[in-house]
Amino acid sequence: HFVPECKFCNKCVSMRIDVANYKFSKSEKRVISKNKDTKLYIRPPSVTMEHLNLYDKYHRFMNDKKDWPYTAISPDEYMKSYVETKEEYAKEFLYIKDDKLIGVALVDILPKSISAIYCYYDHAYSDLSIGKFSILAQIKIAKELDIPYIYLGYWIKDHFSMGYKEAYSPFEILKNRPNLSESSIWEKKES
């Protein structure tokens, strides 16, 4: 889905959470507790008007807050980007509160890893920290399924949109950009 665009920049670094050594902090336990009434459904990706409206609402908010570019997504664009796959590992995590869709996380669940592809949510429910809750739910599922890593995509230290990822410690960063015949070199980090 996402690849670095800058040819001579190495700031975007692949990162993964070390699930086996991950311990939920007190504040993370509070986030989990706040969401005790939030329902989580895991199923193959789909597209509904509720998905599209929430996706657009999230991106309008991020446009105002962080100056992200914003264009409403069409059903076809959403379908091509997130739904059209024949792979059984592609899932969506639906977060429902009071019978309303308040968050969607698009996730690949494989035998040895979970890959967090994308997450969007309703900022009207910011008190629930749905973005954090989604990552914590993925960590919990990875622990239950004995999956060693969760890949959070690219990380840039202290970046206003990607810096949050370093809170999920311990994590590892990819030290090289290997081709298919090379081994990956991962370095452990603590926040």
Predicted regions and their residues:
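A conserved beta-strand-loop-helix scaffold within acyl/acetyltransferase catalytic domains
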Residues: 2-9, 14-127, 167
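Active-site/acyl-donor-binding loops of N-acyltransferases
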Residues: 13-20, 149-191
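Residue-level preference for non-acidic, small/hydrophobic
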Residues: 55, 135-138, 165
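Active-site scaffold segments
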Residues: 108, 133-136, 153
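Conserved acetyl-CoA-binding loop-helix of GNAT-fold acetyltransferases
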Residues: 127-139
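Conserved acyl-CoA
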Residues: 136-148
